């Protein structure tokens, strides 16, 4: 699918997240089982799946044929963010066939000394046709990511950073403001 086809397919629809990491009940070391969750989500009508590992990207794409928003959760020393924090994870997601790459676009410390703006520019230089989803926690980060050229903004980190942790539920105001002030899809996630 083209970038336009993917963005049109998800517009106004619910995207289902099918992910489990080590230590969670649905994580199985020997084999991904997230493709089964994705199968059910497809039957329920989701236009895309969000998932958090290379093996799940591959298994879900094979099972469903749906566009996949892929990410890798990994904590490196010196990095406050853990969602697709380095080019290694971006490379792995692209190689696995991820249709959209989600990455932490908060303005927190990056262990390699680059800014999130520099990281986005590096990704876009290496993969000019990539669809990027910025996982952000507040308005400033969303606007910054949009200005850097990401294709989708998600409120994924709202309520999960030191400076937004007082949120008890979804930040509907953040979603509304970003939808009004940007010209890209805004996906509501987070607490």
Q: Which sequence ranges carry the predicted segments?
A:
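N-terminal amphipathic alpha-helix/helix-capping segment at the start of soluble metabolic enzymes
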Residues: 1-28, 61
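Active-site-adjacent beta->alpha loops and helix N-cap segments on the catalytic face
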Residues: 2-3, 28-29, 50-69, 80-88, ...
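Short beta-strand/loop segments at the ligand-binding rim of alpha/beta enzyme cores
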Residues: 11-16, 64-78, 124-137, 179-190
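Conserved beta-strand positions in the central sheet of alpha/beta enzyme cores
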Residues: 15, 48-50, 101-103, 133, ...
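Glycine-rich phosphate-binding active-site loops on the catalytic face of alpha/beta enzymes
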Residues: 19-21, 43, 72-77, 96-110, ...
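Conserved, mostly hydrophobic/aromatic
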Residues: 41, 60, 93, 145, ...
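Glycine-enriched alpha-helix->loop->beta-strand junction motifs that scaffold or abut catalytic
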Residues: 45, 64-68, 96-100, 126-129, ...
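Catalytic cores of alpha/beta
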Residues: 78-96, 137-151, 184-191
């Amino acid at each position: 699918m083209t970038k336009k086809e993917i963005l049109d397919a998800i517009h106004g629809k619910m995207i289902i997240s099918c992910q489990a990491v080590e230590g969670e009940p649905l994580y199985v070391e020997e084999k991904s089982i997230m493709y089964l969750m994705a199968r059910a989500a497809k039957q329920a009508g989701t236009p895309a799946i969000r998932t958090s590992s290379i093996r799940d990207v591959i298994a879900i794409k094979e099972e469903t044929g749906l566009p996949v928003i892929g990410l890798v959760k990994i904590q490196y020393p010196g990095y406050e963010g853990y969602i697709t924090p380095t080019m290694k994870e971006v490379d792995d997601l692209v190689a696995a066939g991820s249709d959209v790459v989600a990455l932490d676009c908060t303005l927190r410390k990056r262990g390699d000394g680059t800014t999130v703006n520099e990281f986005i520019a590096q990704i876009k230089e290496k993969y000019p046709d990539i669809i990027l989803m910025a996982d952000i926690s507040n308005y400033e980060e969303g606007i910054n990511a949009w200005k850097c050229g990401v294709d989708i903004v998600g409120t994924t980190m709202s309520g999960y950073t030191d400076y937004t942790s007082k949120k008890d539920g979804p930040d509907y105001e953040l979603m509304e403001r970003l939808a009004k002030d940007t010209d890209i899809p805004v996906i509501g996630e987070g607490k």
